[in-house]
Regions:
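N-terminal export signals and maturation junctions of secreted/periplasmic proteins
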Residues: 4-10, 14
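Second-shell loop/turn segments in exported
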Residues: 12-16, 25, 94, 124-134, ...
Length: 190
């Protein structure tokens, strides 16, 4: 379904994702962020040990164990790690969960949702729903790509800076996949 949306529409050309290097970088980043194009909503279903490794700034092991024991653990984790940043309110506001990652690039935070909604002339609530459709997931990724000027990093092969702008917390896990995809696709004829 994503191939249809991305390649049989004007979406990629409209956002100037139109060279082998740009397409390679875009597809590799989206594939990683969406679990191989399978998930349109961020998965925060962590074990305590993983939670401390990925979000160690917010969780020591006892705190991670307490959060992971909650019946609504994904919501609780999102509210903690996304509190007071990206335009979100504090942990009790529920904004972390409300504005957790959605779409192919996992658009995250009240600020990003608000700007994306404004670019389409829709409400934040409508944008949240749209992000979970094939079209919205793809369009939000393209919008984020353009808004953050990521084509320049694809053009120069600066995968590290590009990745930091998308989600710097997972650089080690991404680097091999991204470099491999970038090399393979950028060798394709234009």
């Amino acid at each position: 379904e994503f191939r249809r949306v991305l390649f049989r529409s004007q979406l990629l050309p409209d956002y100037e994702i139109n060279t082998p290097a740009r397409i390679a970088a875009f597809m590799a980043q989206c594939a990683h962020e969406s679990g191989g194009f399978l998930f349109l909503k961020e998965n925060l279903n962590y074990r305590p040990e993983s939670l401390t490794k990925i979000f160690g700034k917010y969780f020591d092991l006892p705190t991670a164990q307490a959060y992971c024991a909650r019946p609504n653990k994904q919501e609780a984790i999102a509210n903690r790690v996304y509190a007071n940043r990206m335009g979100n309110g504090d942990e009790a506001s529920g904004d972390g969960w409300r504005f957790a990652g959605k779409g192919l690039i996992q658009l995250t935070g009240r600020t990003n949702y608000t700007w994306f909604a404004a670019s389409l002339g829709i409400t934040v609530e409508e944008a949240s729903e749209y992000l979970q459709t094939f079209e919205g997931a793809a369009q939000s990724a393209c919008w984020f790509w353009e808004t953050n000027n990521l084509n320049q990093y694809a053009d120069s092969g600066d995968i590290l800076t590009m990745t930091k702008k998308i989600n710097g917390g997972t650089i080690d896990r991404k680097s091999t996949r991204l470099n491999s995809s970038h090399t393979d696709i950028s060798r394709m004829p234009s």
